Amino acid sequence: MGRMHAPGKGLSSSALPYRRSVPTWLKLSSEDVKEQIYKLAKKGLRPSQIGVILRDSHGXAQVRFVTGNQILRVLKAKGLAPDLPEDIYHLIKKAVAMRKHLERNRKDTDSKFRLILVESRIHRLGRYYKTKGVLPPNWKYESATASALVA
């Protein structure tokens, strides 16, 4: 799929392993992986960060193959899932950083334009997540209160 606000086509992607079974050399059981996920989530890490740590430190390349569920579903079952979906969280974080930059550099017109693009992406994602029921129907992105969402 192509990029929304850029000319790139987005053709590059990483290939998942064809075999969906757990590697024979992996000594972690499903329960061990789940405990690691819970421990890392309680530290305040996002699901993608948890996946990177499990891949790099513990050797579990795909949590889904070991546990049978994705990291976010494991967290939801335990009640540890983040309030905001990760993609919208990072967009809000980016918008807050851009606003902070624009307070110091008022004449940076390119950043003003890019902020408009980022905020339009936030609104579009918010609309999508409201229809899917991930966000409450009365959720609304406001730039004034955005820094509290990502703090």
Curated annotation (Swiss-Prot):
Q: What are the alphabetically sorted keywords of the record?
A: Ribonucleoprotein, Ribosomal protein
GO molecular function terms listed in the Swiss-Prot or TrEMBL record: small ribosomal subunit rRNA binding; structural constituent of ribosome
Decide whether keyword Amino-acid biosynthesis is in the record. Answer: no
Q: Which cysteines are joined by disulfide bonds?
A: none
Q: Which InterPro entries match?
A: Ribosomal_uS15, Ribosomal_uS15_arc_euk, Ribosomal_uS15_N, uS15_NS1_RNA-bd_sf
Tell me which PANTHER family the record gives: RIBOSOMAL PROTEIN S15P/S13E, SMALL RIBOSOMAL SUBUNIT PROTEIN US15
Q: What is this protein called?
A: Small ribosomal subunit protein uS15
